[in-house]
Amino acid sequence: MRRREAIAALVAERGDAITITTEQAIGAWRATVPEPPNQIPDHLDIVGCMGSASTIGLGIALAKPERTVIVVDGDGSLLMQLGSLVTIAGAAPANFFHFVFENGVYETSGSQPLPAEG
């Protein structure tokens, strides 16, 4: 499934979930939702801080346990703060969903290949 198709499925089933996108997922998300970017309810674009979407999403999930939190991330971005996965696993919030798209490159910064693609 392509990134835009997967994001379209998430948007369609989102309900009242809080959503967080980062770097390359932002454009695909914005192209899919009907609202203008600054009017998407309960949505946050994480720009300029690769790797932070997962920990920001975790913080929101812990602060708002009654709400579903969906993070849409990229493999390169996640690798910037790989240790966040240990913290997420330790907290294990049932309302936190982290989707990671794999393209094997740091797309935002010039498509440099990841060290261990695949």
Each language-model region and where it sits:
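Thiamine diphosphate
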Residues: 2-5, 13, 32-118
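Cofactor-pocket helix-loop regions in the catalytic cores of large enzyme subunits
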Residues: 1-27
